Amino acid sequence: MDSYNKETIRNTYSAGLIHHLTLVVGLVCVGIGQTLLYTILGPASRKIGISDFSVGIIVTIAALVITLSSGMWGRLIDRLGSRNAYLAGMIFYTTGTLFLGYGLHISVNHSISALSAFYLLLVIRSLTGFLTAGIHPAAMTYVAESTSSKERGAGIALIASAYGIGSIIGPILGSVIGKVSFLLPILVASAISLLGVILGFLVLKPQKKSLTNKEKERILIRLTDKRVLPIFIGISLTYVGFSCFQQTLSFYVQDVFNLSPERSISKIGGLFATMAAFMIITQLLLIQIIKPSINFLLYCGMWSCVTGFMFLILTTQTFNGLYLACGFLGIGFGMMIPAIQSSASLAVTKDEQGGVSGFLFGASAFGYVIGPALGTYIYSINSNILFLICIVVTFLSVFSTRIVLNKK
């Protein structure tokens, strides 16, 4: 009997690991597409003829759409099942990436006016955001349903690290083949995403039962829920700082080093890849192997982010300083984001994981509502003021999260 139980546990673990790795592959595809966008959109926008602030507005409005739809996706995940919601999002993501590539192609070639290009890219990004807002929370829910509370922090970090892997591949892909064409890296990203969809259909299992109306009501996480409201504020502020830096880095590199749009792509790709590499090393090695406490991750992440932003202020006009800054920021955000997400996951019951996953994704999207527009606007005034504001919001995000941790 004991040998039978051990074999059953071993088989269950192996199956769960295969499913989680399948989710990792899909989220790697998403990470590739997203970081390609940040690597290419800045240089492309100046070739199209739209302002830096207009780019921030595109990202901000798309993020607002994601925020408004995240609650709906949280309920759909629990109603349809995390597997079905995840696959639907991946299909829409592949399609949306193709449309984005087409939109950039006709815009860069000036087949349409700069104003028309702005509205076209805005519509494509907004629709894609609405239809794909369930990918990340669905993956988080799938992992939460198959792990214990003790293992949940490591499981969530694994999902976060998947995006980080894509964040390494995406900028490298953009820097290597982006010199040939703005469109080619996006087409390659779409093809890779399609492979993730096919793998998901083959490996992931559908939900065996649906939820009752009473259960659906119970799992709904509201913004006024005192258990997670401070965490909503904390994760939102974290992504405000993250997206401010992410959205303005391409403009910063072009302006400080006086680079052309084509040449800046390879430089920007290297910086994004450095930040993503340190993020993934932190999440795969430090968190998965050492399994430090949430408090350790929170405070070490905070000081690492502060150090990174200070490097941006003090070491201008040197690429070595930029690489150091990106390294510290990768470590910092690699610690802070899973720490805050784990705090939210552990604050609710297992039945509420779907609701809190959508809630968390909406919180991060809300950070992107504020960050890109705020970042590009303040950057047009003074870049150092922008980085100082990023330091302030980093402190505030940790303070807000500590409110929940102190109660627990």
Outline where the language-model segments fall.
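Juxtamembrane intracellular "pre-TM" segments in multi-pass secondary transporters
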Residues: 2-17, 205-233
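Helix-loop boundary and gating motifs at the non-cytosolic
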Residues: 13-63, 239-258
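Hydrophobic core of transmembrane alpha-helices in multi-pass small-molecule transporters
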Residues: 28, 110-134, 320-335
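Transmembrane alpha-helices of Major Facilitator/SLC transporters
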Residues: 64-68, 267-290
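Helix-to-loop junctions at the C-terminal end of transmembrane segments
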Residues: 69-82, 281-295, 379
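C-terminal ends and interior cores of transmembrane alpha-helices
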Residues: 91-114, 304-317
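Cytoplasmic helix-loop-helix junction between adjacent transmembrane helices
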Residues: 124-163
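C-terminal transmembrane helical hairpin of 12-TM major facilitator-type secondary transporters
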Residues: 294-340
